[in-house]
Regions:
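A short beta-strand-to-loop transition that corresponds to the Sensor-1 phosphate-sensing loop
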Residues: 15, 41-46, 66-68, 230-231, ...
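Structural recognition of the conserved hydrophobic beta-strand(s) that form the central parallel beta-sheet
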Residues: 12, 37-43, 64, 73
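Catalytic cores of nucleic-acid endonucleases
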Residues: 310-346
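Active-site beta-strand-loop-beta-strand hairpin of nuclease catalytic cores
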Residues: 297-305
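Accessory nucleic acid-recognition modules appended to NTPase machines
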Residues: 120-291, 297
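Sensor-1/coupling segment of RecA-like P-loop NTPase cores
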Residues: 31-53, 195
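Interdomain motor-coupling "hinge/lid" segment immediately C-terminal to the ATP-binding subdomain
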Residues: 50-168
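Conserved P-loop NTPase "ATPase switch" module shared by AAA+ and STAND
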Residues: 3-22
């Protein structure tokens, strides 16, 4: 009994992946009722879309929505002023020690909680981080239950095995044979592609990074894979969250490459939501001088290397090798440090 007023009412189809007819009806709304605003959302939606022969090409606009970013988390926690100060800080005007310490504390909380809306909402209201772990566990169970809906494509057990294996191989090149089931590599590859299609697993592809676009020199046989949320990741790995919350050095915080995953996800969330963006890394394999840079960004016509480092120490050998070889203007180091610079590296 709710009136539908064109131009004023927003019709929202949630969990639309459960009904193929509802997905197909989106084309009707565009052609027959264009003045009505319609939004559709669903989990593992890409799985369902791949099973529909034609899906409103040119009539439907897609948005790629991710869990909360760290900035959005700060806003949800009511830390608007802290967020403003953080975003206004720079190399020449860093944060005060007090605010820097507070931000690091909130960052560690965010690494544990992740950005799933239900988790963030629960924490914003109750501030009970242990209860949020239960919410994360429930979300993981829900995702794995949803995998069963796509057993016609590949057994749901294979999808679950790959999902678990991605978490264990975070921070290194993904090796199919390291999944629990080693008997059917093709099924494992199919399950991996499905998880990437659904956005639950984010690929980071090797690029030689000699120029732009980075994708022109991508080697898709060399990939790292990221779980889409750090909260989900730490639950899959069974971390003792006290290790993440109370350690002051990044080595402890970077268990399971969680800091590297966080950095990649934040880079992705900062990009346009109207296209499916790609992440790249660089690696040089040489007997006497191997090197690896965690992420490589294309910013306008520049190629910028990004390294995630531990604590307030650590060599930047790989970063400097990249800067020298690729003649990049500057590099970026991400750590628990305040804003600063060292030679041609921004911290």
């Amino acid at each position: 009994n709710v009136p539908v007023v064109p131009g004023e009412t927003l019709v929202f189809f949630d969990e639309i992946q459960s009904c193929r007819n509802a997905i197909s009806s989106l084309r009707f709304f565009h052609e027959q009722y264009p003045e009505l605003h319609v939004v559709a959302a669903g989990s593992l939606l890409e799985f369902a879309l791949s099973e529909i022969p034609s899906f409103g090409v040119g009539r439907i606009r897609s948005m790629f929505i991710y869990p909360f970013s760290f900035d959005e988390f700060l806003s949800a926690m009511g830390e608007e002023e802290l967020l403003r100060v953080k975003n206004e800080a720079s190399l020449i005007s860093p944060l005060s020690d007090l605010l820097h310490e507070k931000l690091n504390k909130l960052l560690k909380e965010f690494l544990v909680l992740g950005g799933m809306p239900e988790v963030v909402m629960n924490y914003a209201v109750k501030r009970d981080i242990n209860e949020c772990q239960n919410v994360l566990n429930d979300l993981i169970i829900s995702y794995k239950t949803d995998f069963a809906k796509y057993k016609k494509r590949v057994p749901s057990l294979r999808i679950t095995e790959v999902f678990n294996s991605v978490s264990k191989q975070s921070g290194s090149k993904f090796v199919y044979s390291r999944t629990e089931s080693k008997s059917d590599i093709q099924q494992i590859k199919t399950a991996t592609e499905l998880l990437m299609m659904a956005g639950l697993v984010i690929p980071v592809t090797h690029s030689s990074s000699n120029g732009i676009p980075l994708g022109a020199e991508a080697n898709r046989k060399k990939r790292k894979l990221l779980i889409f949320d750090t909260g989900i990741l730490q639950r899959l790995l069974g971390f003792d969250i006290r290790d993440l919350l109370f350690q002051n050095d990044f080595d402890a915080i970077n268990k399971g490459a969680i800091a590297e995953v966080f950095a990649g996800l934040e880079i992705l969330k900062a990009m346009s939501c109207y296209e499916k963006n790609d992440l790249y890394f660089w690696q040089r394999e040489a007997v006497s001088s191997s090197a690896e840079v965690d992420y490589v960004l294309q910013i306008k016509d520049k190629v910028i290397p990004v390294e995630v480092k531990s604590a307030k120490k650590g060599s930047m050998k790989s970063l400097f090798i990249f800067l020298e070889e690729k003649k990049s203007e500057y590099g970026v180091r991400l750590s628990m440090e305040n804003f600063s610079s060292y030679k041609n590296v921004n911290v």
